[in-house]
Amino acid sequence: MQLTLWTYEGPPHVGAMRVATALDDVHYVLHAPQGDTYADLLFTMIERLPRRPPVTYTTFQARDLGGDTAELFKTACSQAFERFRPNAMLVGASCTAELIQDDPGGLARALALPIPVVPLELPSYQRKENWGASETFYQVVRTLAGPRAPAPGTPRPAREPGAKPCCNLLGPTALGFRHRDDVREITGLLNELGIEVRTVAPLGASADDIARLGEADFNVVLYPETAQQAAGWLQRFFGQPFTKTIPIGVKATKAFIAEVLQLAGLPADTPLPDALSRSPWYSRSVDSTYLTGKRVFIFGDATHAIAAARVATEEMGFTVVGLGTYSREFARDVRDAAKHYGVEALITDDYLEVEAKVAELHPELVLGTQMERHIAKRLGVPCAVISAPVHVQDFPARYSPQMGFEGANVLFDSWVHPLMMGLEEHLLTMFRGDFEFHDGAAASHLGRAAVPPPAAAPAPAAESSDVPAVAETATAAATVAAPAASAPITVAQWAPDAQKELQKIPFFVRGKARRNTERFAAERGLATITVETLYDAKAHFGR
């Protein structure tokens, strides 16, 4: 067990809450003490949902542990059914209630409720939130759609002549990063291709919609962390293939279109939608100083991290210097992607390890979660959020998808703008000492005579006795600066005047200038970097 102030994922019952809240007429009864009743805060404050999540808690207290907590759970189930009248019910235990082993599934079955009851066995001390969401969605699909599954070996019936191909969108949940906007974007894209979206699940789906998932021709998996397990079950029992391409970025969206056209049985030369993304042209037309070769560190859930690395390198010209995820279930995929970019994958759920890696790599842009936003702010590095977990500002009122062609536009804006936002500050810093633009200068329209120039402070008279002391100090400094021949120089120290000169270099190339100068000094065995060293390095690498 680890004490921390931040976690990338909650316990698995939080994932179950995300699925239950996304569904329309399903209720979740959670065996939990008072301290675990925080779902209202997650969904109403952070996601700003206009309704409370469909979760009922038993809220047992310490004094109840000496009595019959199982009876408390049965009472809570009965009351939840009578009050909310759901068409299906999920039952499970929180991480704390799991310790008392009351078996919520067996207790709910004993009530013989007239609706399907889905028992959730979520090992809170071995698994986490995304796994809990995936397992919950899988169990819901298996319980509700299972009775309609054909007998094993039954061939899938052909689509009726003239009927439009149809599919399901699987994976979006409550509290997901831009899930609602992604659903709207991909639904519109599929409709323009002539493909009907039959059901979106779990977001906005009813129990009856889940039961009829097998009627679609194929499934589109938007978020493998949540939907891949359920999609695999539907493929085995209903013969429904599912997509493997995640449509994040222009190239991936085009590959996604080719894949769905093949699954839908439509010709490969079907015209693409008219509203293509502007980001490819923007990426080519924007000053290459802002984009080409920018060092970027990426961390998030596996789906968004892998997609972000691909977009960063193939569509924006960035250089990936770090790639990682907190999703241990998809660690192999992230490691394979990291090998492609020549970096070592960072698989961890400890934000301190992530912060140490960012500080070590000195990237020029960080793409990550809410925590990476805080890390980048502390380290003074531009940042954009690409993945859950996120805070309230990443549930915007505007339309802001991550997927599809419009999602590519959003990615370009949100990734490139942080790199450009510091230009004004840099210009102010450059001209702060100028006679015309210093802080004490009058407004330009008032004329230079409006404010008298500040009086210069008188220089202290140097006494003759100080001269030898100054000379001795300079000699000692020179002796310290000159290293012994046997001591190799690893990292040279920056002289104050050289550090000041370095700050005059525009921030978007300052990091490269620093690295080149330190490399130049190390190759020549210089212990101290002076202004002359800085300009010698510039001339050397300029050639």
From Swiss-Prot:
Cofactor(s) needed: [4Fe-4S] cluster
Catalytic reactions on record: chlorophyllide a + oxidized 2[4Fe-4S]-[ferredoxin] + 2 ADP + 2 phosphate = protochlorophyllide a + reduced 2[4Fe-4S]-[ferredoxin] + 2 ATP + 2 H2O
UniProt keyword terms in alphabetical order: 4Fe-4S, ATP-binding, Bacteriochlorophyll biosynthesis, Chlorophyll biosynthesis, Iron, Iron-sulfur, Metal-binding, Nucleotide-binding, Oxidoreductase, Photosynthesis
Active site positions, chain numbering: 287
InterPro entries per UniProt: ChlB/BchB/BchZ, LI-POR_suB-like_C, Nase/OxRdtase_comp1, P-CP_red_C, Protochl_reductB, Protochlorophyllide_Rdtase
Pfam families: Oxidored_nitro, PCP_red
Known pathway: Porphyrin-containing compound metabolism; bacteriochlorophyll biosynthesis (light-independent)
Cysteine-cysteine disulfides: none
Residues given in the record as substrate binding sites: 422-423
The family this protein is said to belong to: Belongs to the ChlB/BchB/BchZ family.
Subunit and partners: Protochlorophyllide reductase is composed of three subunits; BchL, BchN and BchB. Forms a heterotetramer of two BchB and two BchN subunits.
Official protein name in the record: Light-independent protochlorophyllide reductase subunit B
